[in-house]
Structures are given as C-alpha cells and as structure tokens.
C-alpha cells in the first residue's frame, strides 16, 4: 500500500516536471524555487503546517538587485502537499 502511494506520488512529480520542461524559454531551474526577479538568499524555515495543510518557505529577498543589499525583505511562500508548486504570492516583511 505504501509502495503504491509512493509510486503514484513519484509519477505525479514526473508528469509535472515533464510539463515544465516544455518551457524552453526559461532560464530558471525546474525544481529549485526562485523568484521572478531580484536576489534571494538560501531558503530557510521550511516547515509543514498540518492545521492548514501547507508547506511554508522563508527566505531573504532583494527585489531591486541581483546581489545582497538593501532594501531587504523576509518572504513567506506557501504550497500544498506536493511541495513543488508554490503560490506566487509573496507575504513580505521588510528587514530594518
């Protein structure tokens, strides 16, 4: 039973990644999270909220440059149980 669930989940990931690979115009990685523009630090604080059924990912973000610097923001992104497709909605808090 557990093996069947794992195979089903793996097949779902493979289908989603295959669909992403058809976008040959993008220079963004297929699996690693990246913002649409700007600089981001390494992801931190990845945790699962069982109450909401969502994964949370936190990282520092500079929307105005491709290197670290001010203004700097903490960003929280969320995803469902697949942990592959994140909601493109930044919840931002400025670092002061």
Curated annotation (Swiss-Prot):
It catalyses: Hydrolysis of terminal non-reducing beta-D-fructofuranoside residues in beta-D-fructofuranosides. Substrate binds at residues 39-42, 60. Pfam families: Glyco_hydro_32N. Its EC number is 3.2.1.26. One of its GO terms (cellular component) is fungal-type vacuole. Keywords: Glycoprotein, Glycosidase, Hydrolase, Signal. Belongs to the glycosyl hydrolase 32 family. This is Invertase 7. It comes from Saccharomyces cerevisiae.
């Amino acid at each position: 039973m557990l093996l069947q669930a794992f195979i089903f989940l793996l097949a779902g990931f493979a289908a989603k990644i295959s669909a992403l690979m058809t976008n040959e115009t993008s220079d963004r990685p297929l699996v690693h999270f990246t913002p649409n523009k700007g600089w981001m630090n390494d992801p931190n604080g990845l945790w699962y909220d069982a109450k909401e059924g969502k994964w949370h990912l936190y990282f520092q973000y500079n929307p105005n440059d491709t290197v670290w610097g001010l203004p700097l923001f903490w960003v929280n992104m969320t995803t469902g149980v697949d942990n592959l497709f994140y909601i493109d909605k930044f919840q931002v808090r400025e670092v002061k």
